[in-house]
Every structure is written in C-alpha cells, then in structure tokens.
Amino acid sequence: KIMAKPSKFYEQLRGR
C-alpha cells in the first residue's frame, strides 16, 4: 500500500 511517497499512487488514481 502507500507507505512512502504516494506520488505514483496518486498519479494512477488521477489517471494522469
């Protein structure tokens, strides 16, 4: 899950 910088996670959620 998100434990470090949730940068990629957020980008994927936003759908880039």
UniProtKB/Swiss-Prot annotation:
Repeat as UniProt keyword: no
Keyword field: Antimicrobial, Fungicide
GO terms, biological process: defense response to fungus; killing of cells of another organism; negative regulation of translation; xenobiotic metabolic process
Keyword field contains ATP-binding: no
Its biological purpose: Possesses antifungal activity against B.cinerea, M.arachidicola and F.oxysporum but not C.comatus and R.solani. Inhibits HIV-1 reverse transcriptase and cell-free translation.
UniProt name for this protein: Beta-basrubin
